[in-house]
Structure formats: C-alpha cells, structure tokens
Amino acid sequence: MVKSKHLLIVYHSQSGTTSAMADAVIKGAKNPDINGVEVQVRDALEASADDVLWADGLLLGTPENFGYMSGAIKYFLDRIYYPCEDKIDGMPYALFVCAGNDGTGAIKSITRILKGLAIKQIQ
C-alpha cells in the first residue's frame, strides 16, 4: 500500500474574502478524484510547527494588507521558523493571495521568509 502524502493548508481571513478563496482551494485539494493525499486545514493563529512537520506540502493563504501579508500569517511564520529550520528542506509550497491589486507585496514578503526555510515554491 502506498503511503498517503500530507498537505497542510494554512490561511488567515479577516473579511471573509480569503476564506472564500480557501474554501475553493480546500474543495480542490479534497476532490474525490485525487487519491493518496490527506489534507489538514488550519487557521494561521492555530497552526503549529508540528502541523508543518507532519506535512509533505504546504499551501498558504493570506489577504494583502497594506502591501504585505496578514499579521496572522507573519505570526505563524515567526512561530514555525526555528522549530522547522533544517527539517523541511525542499518541501513544496504554493500561495494564494486575495488582493485589491496584484498581491506582489504579500507574495514577495512570504517568499523572502520561506527562502530561509529552504522550501520550494511551486506554481
């Protein structure tokens, strides 16, 4: 029997728009046509380093606030950085960003932090 892969989805939504995006992401990740993937969903304020260490892949969702990621996502990244450093090298991740413009500020700020964890962005 093939071991299931683990996908962790972490997001933050204050107004509900990123939550609506996350619902679509979660629906896609849990599609019955996709086999062998176990999905866990966590709010950014509740997600932990243990959740990240469990995962084989990570999806992060954030609104862009003032050209930056949400404070809750930054807080999540601050909490998991050192416990996960050197333990998740090469883990694939992707972002979904809800923004009134192109979301570049949030994407750049998250990408800069995640480069330090040596995980690999996929598109």
Please place each PLM-identified region on the residue numbering.
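Short, well-ordered coil/turn elements that cap or connect secondary structure elements
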Residues: 2, 34-36, 88, 116
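N-terminal beta1-alpha1 ligand-phosphate binding loop
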Residues: 2-32
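Residues at the starts of beta-strands that form the adenosine-phosphate
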Residues: 6, 38, 92
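Short hydrophobic segments within beta-strands
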Residues: 10-12, 42, 96
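Generic alpha-helical hydrophobic packing signal
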Residues: 23-26, 42, 55
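A short beta-strand-loop structural module common to alpha/beta enzyme folds
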Residues: 35-46
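Helix-loop-strand module that forms the ligand-binding subsite of alpha/beta enzymes
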Residues: 44-121
